[in-house]
A protein has these predicted regions:
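Conserved acidic/glycine
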Residues: 1-39, 154-155, 159-163, 181, ...
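Active-site nucleophile and cofactor-binding loops and adjacent substrate-binding regions
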Residues: 27-39, 65-71, 96, 106-127, ...
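Flexible, small-/acidic-enriched active-site or ligand-binding loops
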Residues: 464-467
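Glycine-rich ThDP/TPP pyrophosphate-binding loop and its adjacent helix/strand module
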Residues: 54-55, 62, 110, 114-298, ...
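Glycine/charged-rich beta-loop-alpha catalytic/anionic-binding loops adjacent to active sites
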Residues: 15, 19-24, 54-63, 103-118, ...
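Cofactor-binding active-site loop characterized by glycine-rich and histidine/acidic residues
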Residues: 6, 37-175, 379-380, 408, ...
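A glycine-rich helix N-cap at a beta->alpha junction
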Residues: 85-97, 172-185, 208-212, 439-458, ...
Length: 562
């Protein structure tokens, strides 16, 4: 396919760099430094390498692009504007304003073309690992004519200092996710100053140790053809995920702020903006974007997108279509009718039975755990292990990587086809809190299973007895938290999780609990299960404490207290 002319390439990059300064200046806040430096790389990625179609932003086989260092959102918004994803200059003028299509950090479901919600550093990188897992699994199950795409992620020094990046990179290397390419924005700068103030890691050696292919691109940030070559090399490599280490210069080509930490999050003032525009050779006018350049880039993006889609199956096959559809609550309840509610079980055991009984209705379910598969009830009968050699497996072994598990599940869900379910002990929800919070913000249908929900953990002692975790999760807007009391409520909780358009946390017991409810409280919010003819005290409980509350009521009744 014909490329854009060198003149259009140059002007497109100038537009991105101009917008990267103008939008934060208008908003009086924002981060232009990374966007300025990465403008050529980002333009080459979108115009020459990325498989995408602005006219079909939800095309199943599109390449996914994730900006893990989400503070550089103006870079992504400028690309979406240039490539015709529905953003216009008025949207960029409203950058970081209440209700605009261009919030301070990218938000999935809010801005067309944004795949995941990023901002807290490292989360987007781990989300990308989840998206790559989803692609690998679906390609193995349904073939490359249905699924064969890449996941591209830009991550910076801050992303790689965060602990979650270590967990997620280790998992990705172990699983040999070779459709995953990460571009390391290696500018050596943090908010406080040089990265040398706090970090001396050899990132290349670190990723090689994880099993990644590492491309040392060097200082080629202004050479479009060289950038294209390293991106294609990363795309075409097989057997390992790829890290492209690109030496960049934050704030370039500003004569005042290149390679300075002040370029990160302090909008250039009017004078500094003008001096940079003089270097770029663009007019000193806000939001400069010649219509003929924008039209040429958009037409080119549409042509590339149409060509890319023509190589793949036009429609998903029947099984994929089922995965994309919604299962009805009534059908789920029918599948669970045969569950034995006459036997006392731990609710972690009840969830295993509910999942097994409903499997035919949820072909997109993938289950996993952070090294507690059997303990938490998420070992699904008939599921085989997902691995580098068997990516068709539906049982994911995350290892002792709770934080990565949470964010990877978000990525799997936001890929758009599969429903991830992942389990660990409830006390370790603290390790996952940032990922769960972003699951709620992005409305991803991830099902978090937390067992060992109370002091019933017993002899493990206070380090493993979750006391404050329930209140912590309930405080997250958009997260559905369900703590079933018995097997009937657990079955209803499973129905609720599968029919909810967002994340759910199921809080389950280690210990056996008696069947004391009819399950209706899950649908209605609460249920009276014991009444007194002489009410004096109201006892309220949830989950495994409901049976304790009932015993307390009986004891009070024996003492004449109703």
């Amino acid at each position: 396919m014909a490329r854009l002319t060198p003149e259009i390439d140059a002007d497109a990059i100038r537009i991105i760099r101009g917008l990267a300064m103008d939008a934060p200046l208008a908003a009086k806040s924002g981060h232009q430094g990374t966007a300025l430096a990465l403008a050529p790389l980002a333009h080459v990625l979108y115009s020459r390498v990325l498989s995408h179609d602005p006219s079909q932003p939800k095309w199943l086989n599109r390449d996914r692009f994730i900006l893990s260092n989400g503070h550089a959102s103006i870079l992504q918004y400028s690309l979406l504007f240039l490539n015709g994803y529905g953003l216009e200059l008025e949207d960029l003028r409203a950058f970081r304003q209440m209700g605009s299509a261009t919030p301070g950090h990218p938000e999935n479901g809010h801005t067309p073309g944004v795949e995941v919600t990023t901002g807290p550093l490292g989360q987007g990188f781990a989300n990308a690992v989840g998206i790559a897992i989803a692609e690998s699994h679906l390609r193995a199950r349904f073939g490359a004519k249905q699924f064969d795409h890449h996941t591209w992620v830009i991550a910076g020094d801050g992303c790689f200092m965060e602990g979650i990046s270590h967990e997620a990179a280790s998992l990705a290397g172990h699983l040999k996710l070779d459709r995953l390419v990460c571009i390391f924005d290696d500018n050596g700068i943090t908010i406080d100053g040089s990265t040398g103030l706090a970090c001396s890691d050899d990132v290349s050696q670190r990723f090689k140790a994880y099993g990644w292919n590492v491309i040392e691109a060097g200082d080629i940030g202004e050479n479009l053809d060289a950038l294209e070559r390293v991106l294609q090399e990363g795309r075409d490599h097989r057997g390992q995920p790829t890290l492209i280490r690109l030496r960049t210069h934050i704030g370039y080509p500003s004569p005042d702020f290149t390679d300075r930490h002040e370029a990160h999050g302090n909008p250039f003032d009017v004078a500094a903006t003008k001096r940079t525009k003089d270097v770029l050779g663009i007019p000193d006018e806000p939001f400069w974007a010649p219509q003929e350049v924008v039209a040429a880039v958009r037409q080119h993006a549409l042509a590339r997108g149409s060509a890319a889609r023509s190589k793949m199956d036009a429609q998903p096959n029947a099984e994929v279509a089922r995965m994309l559809g919604k299962v009805s609550a009534d059908d789920l309840r029918k599948s669970l009718d045969s569950l034995p509610h006459d036997k006392d079980l731990a609710t972690r055991q009840s969830i295993t039975l509910a999942v097994g009984a409903s499997l035919d209705l949820v072909p997109g379910l993938v289950a996993g755990s952070a090294d507690l598969t059997g303990n938490t009830g998420v070992k699904v009968p008939g599921f085989t292990a997902f691995s580098a050699n068997a990516p068709e497996g539906r049982q994911v072994y995350y290892g002792i990587r709770e934080h990565a598990m949470g964010a990877v599940m978000v990525g799997i869900a936001l890929h758009g086809v599969l429903t991830p379910m992942g389990g660990t002990f409830f006390v370790f929800a603290d390790y996952m809190k940032p990922a769960i919070r972003l699951a709620a913000l992005s409305r991803s249908r991830a099902i978090f299973v937390f067992s060992h929900d109370s002091v019933g953990v017993g002899e493990d002692g206070p380090t493993h007895q979750p006391i404050e975790q329930l209140a912590s999760l309930r405080s997250i807007p958009g997260l559905r938290v369900i703590r079933p009391a018995d097997s009937r409520e657990t079955a209803e909780a499973w129905v609720a999780a599968l029919t909810h358009d967002g994340p759910t946390a199921l809080i389950l017991s280690r210990q056996t609990v008696p069947n004391v409810t009819d399950g209706s409280a899950v649908r209605h919010g609460a249920q009276v299960i014991r009444e007194s003819s002489r009410p004096q005290v109201t006892l309220i409980g949830t989950g495994s404490e409901v049976s304790v509350v009932l015993r307390a009521a009986e004891e009070l009744d024996s003492r004449g207290i109703g």
